[in-house]
């Protein structure tokens, strides 16, 4: 019988909230007896926006804004049914996008 893995990708704009959520998932998985690989930091995505400061002339005067998206990857190896139940009941912080994939 093949072992199953749970792959969890987390995304957030604030890395502190992301790291706290990642640690919460790791603690929950280890408490239920599963083996955890990670967290693996993935490359950050930086979106930059340049806008004119004034509504009229003076094109040389501009503001730049950026949005940084931080990402983490977790692999849970051989999860038990208790692990899956605990992860489903887990309530993470607002602003963290969670993507879960089940792999064989």
Curated annotation (Swiss-Prot):
GO cellular component, one term: ribonucleoprotein complex
Gene3D superfamilies assigned: Ribosomal protein S10 domain
GO biological process: translation
Family annotation (InterPro entries): Ribosomal_uS10 (IPR001848), Ribosomal_uS10_dom (IPR027486), Ribosomal_uS10_dom_sf (IPR036838)
Entry keyword Ribonucleoprotein: yes
Keywords: Ribonucleoprotein, Ribosomal protein
GO molecular function, one term: tRNA binding
Family: Belongs to the universal ribosomal protein uS10 family.
Biological role: Involved in the binding of tRNA to the ribosomes.
Self-association and partners: Part of the 30S ribosomal subunit.
PANTHER family tied to this protein: 30S RIBOSOMAL PROTEIN S10 FAMILY MEMBER (PTHR11700)
NCBIfam families tied to this protein: PRK00596.1, rpsJ_bact
Protein name: Small ribosomal subunit protein uS10
Naturally occurring in which organism (per UniProt): Ruegeria sp. (strain TM1040) (Silicibacter sp.)
Taxonomic placement: Bacteria, Pseudomonadati, Pseudomonadota, Alphaproteobacteria, Rhodobacterales
Gene name, Swiss-Prot/TrEMBL: rpsJ
